[in-house]
């Protein structure tokens, strides 16, 4: 998923998506351990998506905290 698409989501939606991706990564790790995983590249992609989501959540919280500081 691209960062531009993720920036349109709210923080709650991003956290929900992060939770889904972490669950998927957990399942992929089990498949890898059992030798069932066919597409190892998917694990790398999921990790990067999680990192993107966490970065955007941080950006949004920083922007909202800056906005509140200017109002006071």
Curated annotation (Swiss-Prot):
CDD domains membership: Ribosomal_L29_HIP (cd00427)
Any one of the GO CC terms: cytosolic large ribosomal subunit
Pfam family, one: Ribosomal_L29
Any one biological process term the GO annotation gives: translation
Record-linked InterPro entries: Ribosomal_protein_uL29 (IPR050063), Ribosomal_uL29 (IPR001854), Ribosomal_uL29_sf (IPR036049)
GO molecular function annotation: structural constituent of ribosome
Keywords assigned: Ribonucleoprotein, Ribosomal protein
Domain of life: Bacteria
Similarity comment: Belongs to the universal ribosomal protein uL29 family.
Protein name per Swiss-Prot or TrEMBL: Large ribosomal subunit protein uL29
